[in-house]
Protein backbone atom coordinates (compact mmCIF):
# COMPACT_ATOMS: atom_id res chain seq x y z
CA UNK A 1 0.00 0.00 0.00
CA UNK A 2 1.48 3.31 -1.11
CA UNK A 3 0.93 6.46 0.92
CA UNK A 4 1.84 10.07 0.29
CA UNK A 5 4.75 11.37 2.34
CA UNK A 6 3.85 15.03 1.85
CA UNK A 7 0.78 17.18 2.36
CA UNK A 8 1.25 20.77 1.20
CA UNK A 9 -0.15 23.62 3.29
CA UNK A 10 0.02 27.42 3.33
CA UNK A 11 3.65 27.40 4.42
CA UNK A 12 4.59 25.48 1.24
CA UNK A 13 2.93 27.95 -1.13
CA UNK A 14 3.46 31.56 -2.18
CA UNK A 15 1.04 33.71 -4.16
CA UNK A 16 3.92 35.90 -5.35
CA UNK A 17 4.80 33.13 -7.83
CA UNK A 18 1.73 34.05 -9.91
CA UNK A 19 1.16 37.67 -8.87
CA UNK A 20 1.00 39.85 -11.96
CA UNK A 21 0.11 36.93 -14.22
CA UNK A 22 -3.22 37.03 -16.08
CA UNK A 23 -5.44 34.09 -15.15
CA UNK A 24 -8.29 33.03 -17.45
CA UNK A 25 -10.92 30.84 -15.78
CA UNK A 26 -12.89 29.04 -18.49
CA UNK A 27 -16.45 28.44 -17.34
CA UNK A 28 -18.57 30.02 -14.64
CA UNK A 29 -20.49 27.10 -13.22
CA UNK A 30 -20.16 25.60 -9.76
CA UNK A 31 -16.34 25.40 -9.67
CA UNK A 32 -15.64 28.25 -12.10
CA UNK A 33 -17.52 30.81 -10.07
CA UNK A 34 -15.89 29.71 -6.81
CA UNK A 35 -12.37 29.66 -8.26
CA UNK A 36 -12.69 33.01 -10.01
CA UNK A 37 -13.98 34.77 -6.90
CA UNK A 38 -11.47 33.15 -4.55
CA UNK A 39 -8.53 33.90 -6.84
CA UNK A 40 -9.76 37.48 -7.24
CA UNK A 41 -10.14 37.89 -3.49
CA UNK A 42 -6.60 36.53 -3.08
CA UNK A 43 -5.36 39.55 -5.03
CA UNK A 44 -4.82 37.84 -8.38
CA UNK A 45 -5.63 39.11 -11.88
CA UNK A 46 -8.62 37.07 -13.06
CA UNK A 47 -10.90 37.13 -16.09
CA UNK A 48 -13.59 34.62 -17.02
CA UNK A 49 -13.77 33.06 -20.49
CA UNK A 50 -17.23 32.15 -21.79
CA UNK A 51 -18.40 30.98 -25.20
CA UNK A 52 -21.44 33.23 -25.28
CA UNK A 53 -23.14 36.05 -23.43
CA UNK A 54 -25.92 34.77 -21.21
CA UNK A 55 -26.77 34.07 -17.58
CA UNK A 56 -23.19 33.13 -16.65
CA UNK A 57 -21.91 36.29 -18.34
CA UNK A 58 -24.28 38.49 -16.33
CA UNK A 59 -23.56 36.55 -13.14
CA UNK A 60 -19.82 37.09 -13.52
CA UNK A 61 -20.37 40.81 -14.05
CA UNK A 62 -22.60 41.02 -10.98
CA UNK A 63 -19.84 39.26 -8.99
CA UNK A 64 -17.32 41.87 -10.12
CA UNK A 65 -15.45 39.50 -12.44
CA UNK A 66 -14.66 40.54 -16.03
CA UNK A 67 -16.29 38.16 -18.56
CA UNK A 68 -14.78 37.82 -22.03
CA UNK A 69 -15.37 35.55 -24.99
CA UNK A 70 -13.08 32.55 -24.58
CA UNK A 71 -10.72 33.43 -27.43
CA UNK A 72 -10.30 36.95 -26.01
CA UNK A 73 -9.78 35.63 -22.48
CA UNK A 74 -6.99 33.22 -23.46
CA UNK A 75 -5.03 35.34 -25.93
CA UNK A 76 -3.31 37.37 -23.20
CA UNK A 77 -3.56 34.79 -20.41
CA UNK A 78 -0.49 33.37 -18.71
CA UNK A 79 -2.56 30.71 -16.93
CA UNK A 80 -5.64 29.06 -18.49
CA UNK A 81 -7.88 27.08 -16.13
CA UNK A 82 -10.39 24.62 -17.61
CA UNK A 83 -13.50 24.53 -15.41
CA UNK A 84 -16.10 23.48 -17.97
CA UNK A 85 -17.57 19.94 -18.09
CA UNK A 86 -15.25 17.13 -19.22
CA UNK A 87 -17.05 16.48 -22.48
CA UNK A 88 -17.02 20.15 -23.49
CA UNK A 89 -13.29 20.63 -22.97
CA UNK A 90 -11.96 19.02 -26.16
CA UNK A 91 -14.18 21.09 -28.47
CA UNK A 92 -13.44 24.23 -26.46
CA UNK A 93 -9.72 23.48 -26.70
CA UNK A 94 -9.73 22.88 -30.45
CA UNK A 95 -11.99 25.78 -31.40
CA UNK A 96 -11.45 28.56 -28.88
CA UNK A 97 -8.25 27.96 -26.90
CA UNK A 98 -5.49 26.29 -28.92
CA UNK A 99 -5.68 28.66 -31.93
CA UNK A 100 -5.63 31.80 -29.76
CA UNK A 101 -3.56 31.08 -26.63
CA UNK A 102 -0.16 32.67 -26.35
CA UNK A 103 2.97 30.56 -26.56
CA UNK A 104 3.98 28.96 -23.28
CA UNK A 105 0.77 29.65 -21.36
CA UNK A 106 0.04 27.23 -18.52
CA UNK A 107 -2.90 24.82 -18.86
CA UNK A 108 -4.63 23.95 -15.60
CA UNK A 109 -7.33 21.35 -14.93
CA UNK A 110 -9.53 20.32 -12.00
CA UNK A 111 -9.93 16.77 -13.31
CA UNK A 112 -7.50 14.69 -15.34
CA UNK A 113 -9.92 13.04 -17.80
CA UNK A 114 -9.06 14.96 -20.98
CA UNK A 115 -5.30 14.92 -20.45
CA UNK A 116 -5.06 11.32 -19.23
CA UNK A 117 -7.11 9.94 -22.13
CA UNK A 118 -5.38 12.28 -24.62
CA UNK A 119 -8.54 14.07 -25.72
CA UNK A 120 -6.50 17.24 -25.27
CA UNK A 121 -2.86 17.12 -26.35
CA UNK A 122 -1.17 20.23 -24.93
CA UNK A 123 1.71 22.08 -26.59
CA UNK A 124 5.17 20.86 -25.61
CA UNK A 125 6.09 24.34 -24.31
CA UNK A 126 3.24 24.63 -21.78
CA UNK A 127 3.28 23.67 -18.13
CA UNK A 128 0.29 21.39 -17.48
CA UNK A 129 -0.95 20.81 -13.96
CA UNK A 130 -4.05 20.04 -11.94
CA UNK A 131 -5.65 21.23 -8.72
CA UNK A 132 -8.67 19.09 -7.84
CA UNK A 133 -10.69 20.34 -4.84
CA UNK A 134 -12.42 17.53 -2.96
CA UNK A 135 -15.70 19.40 -2.62
CA UNK A 136 -18.33 21.19 -4.74
CA UNK A 137 -17.83 24.76 -5.89
CA UNK A 138 -20.21 26.41 -3.41
CA UNK A 139 -18.33 24.72 -0.55
CA UNK A 140 -14.98 25.87 -1.97
CA UNK A 141 -16.32 29.43 -1.89
CA UNK A 142 -18.09 29.16 1.46
CA UNK A 143 -15.06 27.73 3.26
CA UNK A 144 -12.74 30.31 1.70
CA UNK A 145 -14.94 33.21 2.84
CA UNK A 146 -15.03 31.75 6.36
CA UNK A 147 -11.23 31.59 6.50
CA UNK A 148 -10.96 27.88 5.77
CA UNK A 149 -10.49 25.76 2.69
CA UNK A 150 -11.45 22.53 0.99
CA UNK A 151 -8.64 19.93 0.66
CA UNK A 152 -7.39 19.29 -2.87
CA UNK A 153 -5.16 17.07 -4.97
CA UNK A 154 -2.29 18.45 -7.04
CA UNK A 155 -0.61 16.84 -10.05
CA UNK A 156 2.00 17.88 -12.58
CA UNK A 157 1.79 16.53 -16.13
CA UNK A 158 4.33 18.79 -17.88
CA UNK A 159 6.92 20.93 -16.14
CA UNK A 160 8.67 22.86 -18.90
CA UNK A 161 9.47 25.87 -16.72
CA UNK A 162 10.70 23.90 -13.73
CA UNK A 163 8.25 25.85 -11.56
CA UNK A 164 4.98 24.04 -12.33
CA UNK A 165 4.55 22.73 -8.78
CA UNK A 166 5.18 26.15 -7.28
CA UNK A 167 2.57 27.69 -9.58
CA UNK A 168 0.10 24.88 -8.91
CA UNK A 169 0.46 25.36 -5.15
CA UNK A 170 0.02 29.11 -5.60
CA UNK A 171 -3.27 28.49 -7.42
CA UNK A 172 -4.25 26.05 -4.66
CA UNK A 173 -3.46 28.72 -2.08
CA UNK A 174 -5.48 31.23 -4.08
CA UNK A 175 -8.63 29.12 -3.84
CA UNK A 176 -8.02 28.30 -0.17
CA UNK A 177 -7.03 24.65 -0.55
CA UNK A 178 -3.65 24.94 1.20
CA UNK A 179 -5.43 26.14 4.33
CA UNK A 180 -6.67 22.55 4.67
CA UNK A 181 -4.05 20.53 2.81
CA UNK A 182 -3.08 19.55 -0.72
CA UNK A 183 -2.10 15.97 -1.51
CA UNK A 184 0.21 15.16 -4.45
CA UNK A 185 -1.04 12.69 -7.05
CA UNK A 186 -0.82 12.11 -10.81
CA UNK A 187 -3.29 12.76 -13.62
CA UNK A 188 -3.58 9.00 -14.04
CA UNK A 189 -4.30 8.29 -10.38
CA UNK A 190 -6.78 11.15 -9.97
CA UNK A 191 -8.69 10.25 -13.13
CA UNK A 192 -8.92 6.53 -12.52
CA UNK A 193 -9.82 6.75 -8.82
CA UNK A 194 -12.36 9.52 -9.44
CA UNK A 195 -14.16 7.51 -12.13
CA UNK A 196 -13.98 4.33 -10.04
CA UNK A 197 -15.49 6.05 -7.02
CA UNK A 198 -18.34 7.50 -9.07
CA UNK A 199 -19.15 4.21 -10.72
CA UNK A 200 -18.93 1.64 -7.94
CA UNK A 201 -20.03 3.63 -4.88
CA UNK A 202 -20.86 7.35 -5.05
CA UNK A 203 -23.37 7.17 -7.91
CA UNK A 204 -23.66 3.71 -9.44
CA UNK A 205 -23.11 1.54 -6.38
CA UNK A 206 -25.23 3.52 -3.92
CA UNK A 207 -28.04 4.00 -6.44
CA UNK A 208 -28.32 0.32 -7.28
CA UNK A 209 -27.90 -0.79 -3.65
CA UNK A 210 -30.74 1.48 -2.51
CA UNK A 211 -32.92 0.39 -5.42
CA UNK A 212 -32.31 -3.33 -4.82
CA UNK A 213 -32.96 -3.06 -1.07
CA UNK A 214 -36.15 -1.03 -1.56
CA UNK A 215 -37.51 -3.41 -4.21
CA UNK A 216 -36.68 -6.46 -2.07
CA UNK A 217 -38.84 -5.19 0.78
CA UNK A 218 -41.71 -4.12 -1.48
CA UNK A 219 -41.70 -7.46 -3.33
CA UNK A 220 -41.99 -9.21 0.05
CA UNK A 221 -45.11 -7.22 0.88
CA UNK A 222 -43.79 -4.41 3.05
CA UNK A 223 -45.28 -0.92 2.69
CA UNK A 224 -43.34 1.20 0.15
CA UNK A 225 -43.34 4.17 2.54
CA UNK A 226 -41.71 2.15 5.31
CA UNK A 227 -39.28 0.56 2.85
CA UNK A 228 -38.27 4.00 1.59
CA UNK A 229 -37.42 5.25 5.07
CA UNK A 230 -35.40 2.14 5.92
CA UNK A 231 -33.43 1.76 2.68
CA UNK A 232 -33.08 5.26 1.22
CA UNK A 233 -34.00 8.14 3.53
CA UNK A 234 -31.87 7.08 6.51
CA UNK A 235 -28.75 6.84 4.35
CA UNK A 236 -28.03 10.55 4.80
CA UNK A 237 -27.77 10.23 8.57
CA UNK A 238 -25.22 7.40 8.27
CA UNK A 239 -23.19 9.18 5.58
CA UNK A 240 -23.11 12.32 7.73
CA UNK A 241 -21.78 10.26 10.64
CA UNK A 242 -19.04 8.73 8.46
CA UNK A 243 -18.15 12.19 7.11
CA UNK A 244 -17.89 13.69 10.59
CA UNK A 245 -16.51 10.78 12.64
CA UNK A 246 -15.24 8.11 10.24
CA UNK A 247 -16.48 4.53 9.92
CA UNK A 248 -15.53 3.72 13.52
CA UNK A 249 -17.44 6.76 14.76
CA UNK A 250 -20.48 5.72 12.75
CA UNK A 251 -20.36 2.20 14.21
CA UNK A 252 -20.11 3.58 17.74
CA UNK A 253 -23.17 5.76 17.10
CA UNK A 254 -25.51 3.01 15.90
CA UNK A 255 -27.15 0.32 18.04
CA UNK A 256 -25.40 -2.93 18.93
CA UNK A 257 -28.02 -4.75 16.87
CA UNK A 258 -27.14 -2.62 13.85
CA UNK A 259 -23.42 -3.20 14.43
CA UNK A 260 -23.80 -6.98 14.60
CA UNK A 261 -26.15 -7.15 11.62
CA UNK A 262 -23.97 -4.86 9.56
CA UNK A 263 -20.76 -6.73 10.33
CA UNK A 264 -22.21 -10.14 9.51
CA UNK A 265 -24.68 -9.54 6.70
CA UNK A 266 -22.72 -6.71 5.07
CA UNK A 267 -19.96 -9.09 4.00
CA UNK A 268 -22.57 -11.60 2.82
CA UNK A 269 -24.09 -9.03 0.44
CA UNK A 270 -20.85 -7.28 -0.59
CA UNK A 271 -18.98 -10.55 -1.14
CA UNK A 272 -15.95 -11.65 -3.15
CA UNK A 273 -18.02 -11.75 -6.34
CA UNK A 274 -18.84 -8.06 -5.87
CA UNK A 275 -15.16 -7.28 -5.26
CA UNK A 276 -14.30 -9.16 -8.46
CA UNK A 277 -16.80 -7.04 -10.38
CA UNK A 278 -15.28 -3.91 -8.84
CA UNK A 279 -11.88 -4.93 -10.19
CA UNK A 280 -13.44 -5.53 -13.60
CA UNK A 281 -14.95 -2.04 -13.49
CA UNK A 282 -11.55 -0.61 -12.55
CA UNK A 283 -9.90 -2.47 -15.42
CA UNK A 284 -12.38 -0.90 -17.88
CA UNK A 285 -11.33 2.50 -16.59
CA UNK A 286 -7.59 1.75 -16.66
CA UNK A 287 -7.71 0.31 -20.18
CA UNK A 288 -9.51 3.37 -21.55
CA UNK A 289 -12.55 1.32 -22.56
CA UNK A 290 -14.92 3.32 -20.36
CA UNK A 291 -13.62 6.63 -21.73
CA UNK A 292 -13.99 5.36 -25.29
CA UNK A 293 -17.59 4.26 -24.63
CA UNK A 294 -18.45 7.52 -22.87
CA UNK A 295 -17.10 9.70 -25.68
CA UNK A 296 -19.16 7.68 -28.17
CA UNK A 297 -22.26 7.86 -25.93
CA UNK A 298 -21.91 11.63 -25.57
CA UNK A 299 -21.54 12.04 -29.31
CA UNK A 300 -24.84 10.20 -29.85
CA UNK A 301 -26.73 12.53 -27.52
CA UNK A 302 -26.36 10.39 -24.36
CA UNK A 303 -29.26 7.96 -25.04
CA UNK A 304 -28.23 5.64 -22.19
CA UNK A 305 -28.16 8.53 -19.72
CA UNK A 306 -31.47 9.98 -20.94
CA UNK A 307 -33.21 6.60 -20.81
CA UNK A 308 -31.73 5.74 -17.41
CA UNK A 309 -32.79 9.07 -15.92
CA UNK A 310 -36.33 8.55 -17.23
CA UNK A 311 -36.48 5.10 -15.61
CA UNK A 312 -35.35 6.51 -12.26
CA UNK A 313 -37.83 9.39 -12.43
CA UNK A 314 -40.69 6.95 -13.08
CA UNK A 315 -39.65 4.37 -10.48
CA UNK A 316 -41.78 3.52 -7.46
CA UNK A 317 -39.05 4.56 -5.03
CA UNK A 318 -38.84 8.01 -6.63
CA UNK A 319 -42.62 8.47 -6.52
CA UNK A 320 -42.76 7.42 -2.87
CA UNK A 321 -39.83 9.71 -2.06
CA UNK A 322 -41.58 12.68 -3.66
CA UNK A 323 -44.75 11.92 -1.70
CA UNK A 324 -42.81 11.81 1.56
CA UNK A 325 -40.83 15.02 1.02
CA UNK A 326 -43.37 17.23 2.79
CA UNK A 327 -43.44 14.84 5.75
CA UNK A 328 -39.65 14.74 5.92
CA UNK A 329 -39.30 18.53 5.65
CA UNK A 330 -42.04 19.17 8.24
CA UNK A 331 -39.93 17.62 10.99
CA UNK A 332 -36.89 19.79 10.33
CA UNK A 333 -36.31 22.45 13.01
CA UNK A 334 -36.80 26.03 11.86
CA UNK A 335 -33.48 27.80 11.40
From Swiss-Prot:
- Coiled-coil features, chain-numbered ranges: none
Q: Where is the KARI N-terminal Rossmann domain?
A: 5-185
Entry's EC annotation: 1.1.1.86
Q: How is the cofactor bound?
A: Binds 2 magnesium ions per subunit.
What highest taxon heads this organism's lineage? Archaea
Q: Which cofactor does it need?
A: Mg(2+)
Q: Which GO terms describe its biological process?
A: isoleucine biosynthetic process; L-valine biosynthetic process
Protein's pathway: Amino-acid biosynthesis; L-isoleucine biosynthesis; L-isoleucine from 2-oxobutanoate: step 2/4; Amino-acid biosynthesis; L-valine biosynthesis; L-valine from pyruvate: step 2/4
KARI C-terminal knotted domain residues are 186-331
InterPro entries on file:
6-PGluconate_DH-like_C_sf, KARI, KARI_C, KARI_N, KARI_prok, NAD(P)-bd_dom_sf
List of catalytic residues: 111
Enzymatic reactions: (2R)-2,3-dihydroxy-3-methylbutanoate + NADP(+) = (2S)-2-acetolactate + NADPH + H(+); (2R,3R)-2,3-dihydroxy-3-methylpentanoate + NADP(+) = (S)-2-ethyl-2-hydroxy-3-oxobutanoate + NADPH + H(+)
Q: Which UniProt keywords apply?
A: Amino-acid biosynthesis, Branched-chain amino acid biosynthesis, Magnesium, Metal-binding, NADP, Oxidoreductase
Which residues does the record give as Mg(2+) 1 binding sites? 194, 198
Q: What does the UniProt record say this protein does?
A: Involved in the biosynthesis of branched-chain amino acids (BCAA). Catalyzes an alkyl-migration followed by a ketol-acid reduction of (S)-2-acetolactate (S2AL) to yield (R)-2,3-dihydroxy-isovalerate. In the isomerase reaction, S2AL is rearranged via a Mg-dependent methyl migration to produce 3-hydroxy-3-methyl-2-ketobutyrate (HMKB). In the reductase reaction, this 2-ketoacid undergoes a metal-dependent reduction by NADPH to yield (R)-2,3-dihydroxy-isovalerate.
Task: Name the family the entry cites.
Answer: Belongs to the ketol-acid reductoisomerase family.
Listed HAMAP family: IlvC
Its name, as the record gives it, is Ketol-acid reductoisomerase (NADP(+))
Which gene holds the coding sequence for this protein?
A: ilvC
